Every structure is written in structure tokens, then in C-alpha cells.
């Protein structure tokens, strides 16, 4: 064995390539061994350093792959299993064990994460040259017994099924020991690069090969100073020094310090020596120079997005300076959190990149198909799982319109469970759904699925056949082919990998579970676990790309230019964690009890020295320039600076704050025309009117010149920056169709309220007639209709029965009405809602019982008013009351709290009661002095705070809550005193005031009608204070944002509370005369129409949405 080491300023790969080349020239077969994660990069570098750029005698590979070269022709009839196959073996073993057989892990038998941990432990034991019997001295004897029982059963299963139960290195080890490879190995040289430690399995293999091979050359990085030091604990090179000394002591070899004629980057070498001296408590007569500050930079950026943008700009500048993409390497502290930002921003800057990380297949439609299939069976046909399956794009050749219809109906009827999906759908809403069509679609979707999922427990091979029949029935193969025909080349490659993984898993299921009796649940669980564990394997489309990978795999001299992102305390250094079934303490006790070349790794024990060595490798990763960057905010939280970056700052490396000044007049601040274009668009146009300082003016002068040239060249148009939400006038043909000019405009109080809430909301509901998703479950509309029906029956019952008997009779009759019986007997939740409604009816009825001064004139009065021949006001009055003096009043039942607020009325948000009074006035041909008021009756159970009300006042307070609230005519209040009426001064009006309210209400209708007829519907939700928006913003459609579009909101007129009623009445009175003139001047003649009392469906719904 030959041991070599060199400083990190030297290129060890170049030195070892020379060694490999010299042995190859002597006719030796050379295997250049690198760690698995670095073999691709090592192969590229070795080829670059070879004089002839290629060699048939040198193979760059890893330990496990090298073993395949020697044992490839060795007869091995046993079936090979990958990780998925091993997981199936453990699943099968645990399937036959009961909860009581495993005292510690009994409840985890079918947990996929636990099975994956078993697979990891199985592989780790192989790498440690151990068996499960070596797992002594665990914290619990029961835990040891469970693991021995599981692994012993798995081993028996592997032997019984003739599966290969040893690793490639174990098989290689066996062949070497047998002597079959002595001749081949005698002419073999191993060159080992990139290691600072061996696993126990690798360690044993190297020891054996040392006696058989012609030579083994091991190289690593460390300094002469560190290797010769007596005390290395805490040294930056501790990992490599310990590695070298262990090998030197074991094989009685003195390591050689080697160098090349090429001089590395002096700046990185000097910084390395300074850092080493800080950790070994020595002194060096060196300081950081200006050249060093240029070679190594430390950035601080606000957040990750800005950080990646700054790197992208620097890359574009390097390209402008003549550099290549392949000369640039981007390292990430946290791959997952940076992946999205890197992808989006690099594409914006036209930077091709290769992300050296396997990507999970979990988002592929086929994986979603299998996942949904398993969840449907496990959760008994849950609606969302079934819809995910049919919407995967791989389930049958159904049209998207049919699938949308099916999904809409399932959500409407709240279909859940196998029984409901197998039964005919019968629920309907006003015959809105074509049940014949939907049931035919249901049969096509559900029947092949249920035929497979309802299969009895049987052999795995039989279930596989039934699965294939099901997949063919739903056209999965043809749908996968169709998916690929429309895909890009990258997507086609992904589809091929997914299909290959799927078929491979099916083959392994056949192999392992072919003769095993399985339920459909277990069968699908095995498929799902296998598919979710699969990853895409990607290769760069071209060599000339920017490589992106995690930083802890870095080697010195990886690229001329290196950018390391996310170098915060949480990620630099990375702290390894033990997530296996064995704790660190248990591992330590096991290692103490075992002999040489048998060892379990204890990750937490090597964190410190591994972190130091990775940091030194990172600081020497670049040959020209290294940028270390840290964001202040990462993953939505603030993080501190890494201790290694603090050390660099202490040495004198300056901290550069990037992204602070967006208007620096430098070329690299423009970088790429797409970025410049997006920056221009993102700027708030209002800021362009401000006075610009000289620096900003210089920036824009350079930017605009560059942008104009590039845009003219590519014929690109900059879209106009619009910071408001505007609408387009509705086409005249549409308006004529919805609101014919020869007919009066239909409006209701609810429609008017909607209009003044937000004009665009009116457009959606009454022009486009969009509806919210319906549900078979009762909601506020159904609750209100139910209570209306109860009180109609009570008030219309003229029999001699007592009031309470009438009420109970009305409740019973209403419950038996077919619509309510269907609604309120669907499930326990619906029945509970009905109980609550019955309680509300009984509570509210107490108000109706004792009201001798008032007689119910009529109920459910439909009205149809024609206003100046141009507006038809429609609606339904719940109840009309008559006083003993003949005055009429209106009662509107409400399930929620409503009061008459004159401020809201003035602003168009509460016109209902006044509109109903207008209907009374015109329907009964009475004057304002013959009306006594309009009021709401809240149908609810009073809710009282018992901590604030004594028991003696409880009944009185509850009775007080059940009162009529609205607006009343002052002259009629003497007839109402003593009744259940809230007669506050703020809600009582004299005859003249009532006339003013009625006239102003007409103005509200006329103003709304004028805008509606114009076809211009603004997005103008109302605001009360000008700071927040209370109106319906309909954000998902309008994209209205209060902070950006407040100027378009309709601000309500608000007056001080003191004298508010009188002030609003005065404002209304000012417009009274003008309104009368407009009515007389703008009267339009219409053909005589049927004035029969009728109302369209939407207005009926409006008046019952309480």
C-alpha cells in the first residue's frame, strides 16, 4: 500500500491520475476508486488529466461497481433484489406476525416508514460486516428480541425464495477468499481518491485486496503541519489525519507528502493556512491581502430569492467576460428550499443548469393513480380519493366535461362510501341534473373499479392478473401512451422511467408474493409504497451547463468559479442526525463488543471533524473565485451567520451586502434583458414621477438604452403597467338578451343590495347568473324556508286549538313535507339541524302568542311594482300585520341578526324594509300615515351571558331579545307600546320622514337601474373607513387587493352618531324634488304587460336567503 497526501492548494486528483497513468503504462489494470456520489465528477477530471484523454486500462468507478467487474461472469442463479424488493420481503415477514409477537414494534407492522427503517438497518449491517445476532446490549431486551425475530424470518424467507442475500462487496469478498481471482488481482492496481473514512465492509475489503493486488494507492488532503502534529483534535484536517494514521499504523506504511509543479491559487492556500492556525492554536506571519479579498467573497442578502437573483446576475456577467457555463458550480446549503428559486430565476436569466439530485416520482399521474387506488380501498371510497383517481388523466378515455359533471354532482350530493357510489344517484335540485346521464357515467367509472377492489383474499399472482384486467378495462396503457405523445422530451423520459418502475414493482410482487395469500388492501399497500419510494434518474442534456448540487459533497478544485448559497448557521456545517432504529448509545456498546473490521457508524461522533474538513474543501473548491452567501431570512425564518463565515470575517474578508441598491449603474446590475424587463414591469408607475437622484438617472439611462436595442432587435413589446382593476362594457347584444329594452328592468331588494355591495358582484349573479356550489345538506337558505313554512302554518291556522298545539302541529306537518323530509333526514348532522330549528321555532313563537293589538292580514305576499314604466320591483313579504286602527305593517323573518340602519340604507345596503313599505303603499293604495312600520323578527334561540345577567333577570332578558326590530311610524307607536317591539327613538319616524325614506329608496333603484342599463359594471366593493374593504371583493375572479386598489372601492358616507338620523334625512330630502322631476321627465312607455303577482326564481330565492 502506498499512502499519499498533499495540501488543498494542490490538485490531488491530478497527482493520483499521474500515478494511475504510470501503472497503466506498465501494463497494469487500474481501478480509480471514488465515493459513489462523486464518481461522475471524478471520471470527468481523470479524463481531463490523462495525457491521451482516455485509457482502456484505467477504470474510474466505485467499490461496489468494481466488484461487479470481477464477479460479473461468476455464476449466481439467485434472484437479485433492490431496496423495493427488500421492503416487500420485510412486509411479507411482518404480515405473518401478530401484534402480540412483537412486543416493541407490534403496532408498526404495516407502517411503511418502519419497513424502510428495517431495510436501511439490513443494508447497514451488511456494510458493518455484522448480522442481527451482533445487536447485543440494546436499551431493551424486547427490542433486541423483536429485531432478531424479524431479521431471522427475513433471512429464512430470502433463503427459501433463493434470493441473493448478500451485498456485492460480500460476494466479491467471498470470491477473493476462495482464490479464484488471485491471478486477475495480481495485475491490478487500486487508486483510491476522495475518502476520509471507510465503512467496515470497505475496510475489510481493502485489507484483503492489499494482500492480493499489485498495489493500492490511497490519497487524501492534509497539511504537513497537521500530519506531524502531536495533537490533532479540533484541527481542520482531523478527519484526514485520523484516516491516514489509521492506515499507516495498520499497514506499516509511512505516508508520502507529494506536490506538483503547478502552483495552486495562492489566495485560497493562504486563507487555508490562516484557518488552520486558528484551530491548532499556532501563529503564522501572514494576513489577508486585497487579492485574497477578490478571490473569496462573503455576501449577505435579505432572502433566498434575492440571493439566487444576485448569483444569476453574476453568472451572466461571467458569461459576458468569456467564461463557460461548465466553469461555474452552484452549491446549496439546503437543497429543498432552494430548488424552486433556482429553477425559476435561472430560467428567467436563460441559464441552463443541471440539478444533481434525484427527484421523487410522487407527483407523476401514474403514481397518483396507484396512490388514489390504495386510498379508495383503505378509506372505503372517500370522494376526494375517487375524484383524484378519475382526474389523474389515466383512468379511461372520459371527456373532461363528463368528469367535471361527475365531480360537481358528487360534491353536490355529498356522495361518500362504497354503498352510495354503487347505488343509483337520486338526489336532484330543481331537476338541474340529468340523473340518467350521471348514473350511466357512474356505472362506467365505478363498475370496473369495484370489481377489482372487491376481490376476495387470494394469491398474489391471481391479484396481479385481476389488476392487469382492471388496468386494461380503464385503458391505462393507452392513456400512458397518449400522455407521452403530448409530452416534451424530458417528460417522455420521465414517463418511461415511471412505467419501468411500475412494471418492475409488479414483477417483484409476482416473485415475492406470487404464492402468498394477499388481501386487496395489502396488495395495493405494497404497490403504493414501492411507487412512492421511486425517484427519477436524470443526466445533464449537455456538458456545458451550470452544475447545482449540495455543498457537503464538494471536493477541492471542483470548478473555476463556485457560488455557495444558504451558508447559514443551520446548514453550514451540516449536523448529521441519527434517524435509524438504533440509538448512538446502542451503536457504541455494540462496537465495543465486536472485533476489527466490524463497526456501526455513529454519525454524531464525526460531525465536528467532518464539518471542518468539508469547510476546508469548500474554501478550496474554486480555482479562480469563490462566493459564500448567506440570506438573513431562510425558510420564512431568520437565521444566524455560520461560525465559518465569522472566522473569515475575523481574518479580514469583508462582508458584502448585496441587493441593497437596486439602481447601481453597473453592467452586472442589468445582466439579462428578461430580468431587466421584469424589473421595469414590477416598478410602481407612480414612482416614475418622482425626482431622481444622479445615480438613479444614470442607471435608467444605461438600462433604457440597452432595453430599447434589445427590444427592437427581438421585436418585443412591453405590456402597459396597469395598477388598477378595470372592466369592459358588456356587449349590447348580451345586455339586450338579459335585459330587453322593451321590458322594464327587474330588480329586487336583495339585487339592489348586491349592486351597492359591489357592482361586479351584481354582474356575476344577475347577468352571468353564476351560482355557488350547491349541496344536498341544508344551509341557511333551507333553514330560513323551513321556519317560514312553520310560521305560515301557525299564523294561518284558525282552529280553536291552543297556540302551542298549533305550533307543534305546524312543526310536524313541515317535517313531513317531502323537500324537508329529504333534507333533514339525510344523516345525523341533518337531523341535529332539524332539532335546532324546532327549538328556534318554539322560542320565536312566544312573540307571536301574545300580540292582541295586531292582526295578521296575510302571509307570503308577492308583489310586482312598476316604477316609472322602467323598473319592475319584485319580492315576497313574509307577513303583513294590521293594527286595530287599520294601519298596516310588514314583518320579515330572519335567521340572522338584522336591524334597520339609516346609514346603511342611505348607502344602498339596507333597502329591504323600506321597499316592502313601498309595496304596501302601492298594493293597498294607502298613504304613509296608514303604515305603522316594517320590522324584522329574528328566529333564533336567545344567547345570554350568564356571568353578566342574574338568574332573576334571565327570563326578562331572554324575552327582550325576542322583539320586533326595524323602523316604526311615530304616530302609531302608542298601539305598539307594551308589545314585543323595539321602539327606540332612533328607529321611529314621523310621516314626513317616512315619505323621505320612500322617495330616497326610489332614487336608489333608479340610480342602480341606470348603471345596469349602461352595461358598465365597476369592481367597487364598499369601504366604510377608506382603510379596509367590507364589501365582497371576489378576489379569485377580480384579483382585487385592498392595499393596491383602495382607490376603486366605493367609500360610504358616514356621519357622526349624534344627530345621525336627522342629518341623513336632511341629505335625502335635498334630492327629493330633483328625483320627482326626473321621474316625470324620463317616463318611458312600455307595452301593457301582465301584472299578475309573480316573481322569477332567483328573486324567490333572494327573499328566502335569510
Curated annotation (Swiss-Prot):
<keyword id="KW-0238">DNA-binding</keyword>
<dbReference type="GO" id="GO:0003690">
    <property type="term" value="F:double-stranded DNA binding"/>
</dbReference>
<keyword id="KW-0067">ATP-binding</keyword>
<comment type="similarity">
    <text>Belongs to the helicase family. AddB/RexB type 2 subfamily.</text>
</comment>
<dbReference type="GO" id="GO:0016817">
    <property type="term" value="F:hydrolase activity, acting on acid anhydrides"/>
</dbReference>
<dbReference type="InterPro" id="IPR027417">
    <property type="entry name" value="P-loop_NTPase"/>
</dbReference>
<keyword id="KW-0540">Nuclease</keyword>
<comment type="subunit">
    <text>Heterodimer of AddA and RexB.</text>
</comment>
<dbReference type="GO" id="GO:0000724">
    <property type="term" value="P:double-strand break repair via homologous recombination"/>
</dbReference>
<keyword id="KW-0347">Helicase</keyword>
<dbReference type="GO" id="GO:0005524">
    <property type="term" value="F:ATP binding"/>
</dbReference>
<comment type="function">
    <text>The heterodimer acts as both an ATP-dependent DNA helicase and an ATP-dependent, dual-direction single-stranded exonuclease. Recognizes the chi site generating a DNA molecule suitable for the initiation of homologous recombination. This subunit has 5' -&gt; 3' nuclease activity but not helicase activity.</text>
</comment>
<dbReference type="InterPro" id="IPR049035">
    <property type="entry name" value="ADDB_N"/>
</dbReference>
<dbReference type="InterPro" id="IPR038726">
    <property type="entry name" value="PDDEXK_AddAB-type"/>
</dbReference>
<keyword id="KW-0227">DNA damage</keyword>
<dbReference type="InterPro" id="IPR014141">
    <property type="entry name" value="DNA_helicase_suRexB"/>
</dbReference>
<dbReference type="InterPro" id="IPR011335">
    <property type="entry name" value="Restrct_endonuc-II-like"/>
</dbReference>
<dbReference type="Pfam" id="PF12705">
    <property type="entry name" value="PDDEXK_1"/>
</dbReference>
<keyword id="KW-0269">Exonuclease</keyword>
<protein>
    <recommendedName>
        <fullName>ATP-dependent helicase/deoxyribonuclease subunit B</fullName>
        <ecNumber>3.1.-.-</ecNumber>
    </recommendedName>
</protein>
<dbReference type="GO" id="GO:0004386">
    <property type="term" value="F:helicase activity"/>
</dbReference>
<keyword id="KW-0234">DNA repair</keyword>
<keyword id="KW-0547">Nucleotide-binding</keyword>
<keyword id="KW-0378">Hydrolase</keyword>
<dbReference type="Pfam" id="PF21445">
    <property type="entry name" value="ADDB_N"/>
</dbReference>
<dbReference type="InterPro" id="IPR011604">
    <property type="entry name" value="PDDEXK-like_dom_sf"/>
</dbReference>
<dbReference type="GO" id="GO:0008409">
    <property type="term" value="F:5'-3' exonuclease activity"/>
</dbReference>
